[in-house]
Amino acid sequence: MGRGGRWAVALAAAIVWVGGASCSRNREQSQPFYLRSEVGSQGPEFAKALYQTVSTRMVPGNRLRWANNGAVFDVMEEELSRARSSINIVLFIWRPGQASERILSVVTERARAGVACRVLVDPLGSGPFEKDIKPRLEEAGCQVHIFRPLPADENLARNHRKIIVVDGRVAITGGLAIQDEWLGEARNEKEWRDTNARVEGPVVAQLQQAFAENWQESTGELLPSSDFPALGNSEPSLDEVRDGWGGFVASTASPELTRAERLTQLMVRAARKRLWIAQSYFTPNEPLIALLVEQARAGVDVRVLAPGDKNDHKSITLLQRATYSTLLAAGVRIWEYQPSMMHAKTMLVDDRLVLVGSINYDALSFNLLEEGSLVLEDQEAARGMEAFFLEDLKHAKEVKAR
């Protein structure tokens, strides 16, 4: 069974599993999790709400550059080639092809030059990796491990994070994968549409920590202290200028309530004027649907960009469309991306707050997967996301209520 088939089976099994877990949760709680408190989308109010919700501290002094579609490989090559001390990579998908050859070339060259290279991949997403790619990395001196090895189909708690950290100073994250579908410019179904970010600054230590916890589980090893350079030692004041404040939220499996679900609801709740969502697997659960409905009825400009018929999992398209009538009736506007698979997982909240990462609105991300998303309060980053979201809508078809 190929990757797509195994992933579809995993999602179906997750829905059944989550149904049982939800029943268990409901016996202990009077109702499913629903974030009721209002919260602002910027400044100390949001930063404190984020800390309460997922234990992530917003830190200042970060700079973000968008790296969408095939441009992410240019950014990866550029940053990896600059590595002097360490390269740490955790990915759900790394598969043979042109994209793989580009990254292999840089990583193996750096490893042979003495850079400590650590690679961790998930076997469910990366099928041929262990046979075709792992030996070449190891021959060059890289440490390579498979996260929770096969039979992966018997363990749905997979690693869906997409994190690359170079020298502890620069990180790349988003919906990315090392696979040829990510190389192009989303012009046709062979070139996927995705959103990624390069970030530098103190928040990189939080992405490094997310890698470190997965590496420790797989190897029993800690990263050296040199992988956490001092990028800002002083305790920040929440009253400082807000541009460049960011935090990385790492989520792990739980039968009760994950940080992925908590974070998603917090971002939705924070919106006062607009909430623009790009979501590759849009199958929100009932509490999230209710929250989106509430925000739309309160006058928030709620827009959802999801895949259309080019979705790589047709069964998810059916589940996705089953949510439309309730959302449309409340005033949520929905578009389906037409040229190719739309794989982004982003949120734009009001005028300053953005999210980019690996979290999907589905039963797997909210319950079973290792996930991670970057949250950044930054006006320039928000303007960039606004621009490419509007550009994406030009290539999408708006769904109308029947």
What are these regions (language model features)?
Residues 1-9:
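Bacterial N-terminal signal peptides that target proteins for export
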Residues 10-18:
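Bacterial N-terminal signal peptides
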Residues 8-11, 166-167:
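Intrinsically disordered, low-complexity segments enriched in polar/charged small residues
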Residues 20-402:
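Charged, low-complexity intrinsically disordered terminal segments
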